[in-house]
């Protein structure tokens, strides 16, 4: 936790205030990330349970070990049988309460160790399914073999794993090629500031300085 705080402080250019985040983004994802400072750090757990909205771009017909572009393609599958109607029907299968197995390349813990540390060493990682909720899922664009979807989901949802499962349900494969978190609770992308603008904004706030 302390290392995480130091990393955030360095990234934001702040040193002497309490700081934390209410949910990380995947390395290749962009979008809303709630940063809490000072007394607001006490609300981190509350923010973590807010529903999240994502816009995801999926490439059908190919998979990667990480389910995104972090790793290279490891297998290809046919896509000629896939139609827009088939995609729309499959997406609705994921609406509601579902069980999802997290990616091996994730921060989930296995016997006290991070899954991604084990996966990067080549160890086989077995993760248990987690119960989560997909409140909304819709097809935004369909340019086969690429599709773009919007997802509103609960805490703990891995959109990379959802891409994997959608690919399998389409009797093919899939991986993420783009991911934007567009909303956390009521905080939308258009309400946010760029990371580089944070120090200037912070100077205008009343903050509680901490002693290391």
Please name every model-derived segment.
Residues 1-5, 9-212:
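Catalytic/RNA-binding core of pseudouridine synthases
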